[in-house]
């Protein structure tokens, strides 16, 4: 029994050592091992933190039916700066895990990212910063996905989150421009289409263009 335990621990330590030392090796085994470690260890734990933080925000939000309901339940604290430290330990955990995934498991070989989970890490990084109301750093993370991973399966989600962040920064005209361009793409899925129109409606309302807002909300 003890021999089997020792063998298992030895194999696990050896595998961990290989993963830790392999970010520049251009082989399928190393791509697979880094992607696996990123997804099922680091990003999983970060995702749990992110989900818990979002649940806490929703639990602490109360609808005022005498006021226009926002697209997203999140109370904005006006005196925060873009460099403020995270307020939530859940979002701090998510940001730390995303950063760890990027720093330890990114496999940029020949100018191309070989770890298929790194775009997910940047998306989590941006979301954690967004919910912590550090919108400028969040925008940096979303823009990085659009610049570095144009063929990512998460590209539409990243575009939606970029515009959510732009709206929080008061860039409503830019949101309308970018979302209108996004909606020209006939390949967008129903949820992306719905999120995009909700953002358009909110941005038009922020600019006090009520007729345009109503038209988009009806979509």
Language model regions located:
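Acidic, polar-rich low-complexity tracts and alpha-helical solenoid repeat scaffolds
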Residues: 3-6, 21-219
């Amino acid at each position: 029994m003890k021999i089997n335990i020792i063998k298992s621990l030895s194999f696990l330590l050896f595998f961990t050592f290989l993963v830790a030392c392999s970010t520049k090796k251009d082989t399928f085994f190393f791509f697979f091992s880094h992607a696996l470690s990123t997804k099922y260890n680091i990003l999983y734990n970060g995702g749990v933190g992110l989900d818990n933080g979002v649940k806490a925000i929703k639990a602490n939000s109360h609808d005022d039916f005498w006021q226009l309901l926002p697209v997203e339940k999140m109370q904005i604290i006006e005196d925060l700066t873009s460099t403020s430290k995270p307020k939530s330990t859940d979002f701090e955990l998510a940001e730390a895990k995303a950063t760890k995934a990027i720093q330890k498991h990114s496999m940029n070989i020949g100018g191309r990212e070989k770890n298929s989970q790194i775009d997910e890490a940047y998306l989590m990084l941006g979301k954690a910063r967004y919910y912590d109301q550090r919108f400028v750093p969040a925008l940096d993370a979303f823009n990085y996905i659009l610049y570095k991973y144009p063929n990512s399966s998460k590209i539409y989600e990243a575009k939606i989150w970029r515009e959510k962040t732009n709206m929080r920064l008061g860039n409503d005209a830019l949101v309308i421009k970018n979302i209108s361009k996004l909606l020209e793409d006939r390949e967008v899925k129903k949820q992306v289409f719905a999120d995009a129109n909700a953002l358009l409606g909110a941005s038009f309302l922020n600019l006090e263009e009520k007729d345009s807002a109503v038209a988009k909300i009806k979509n």
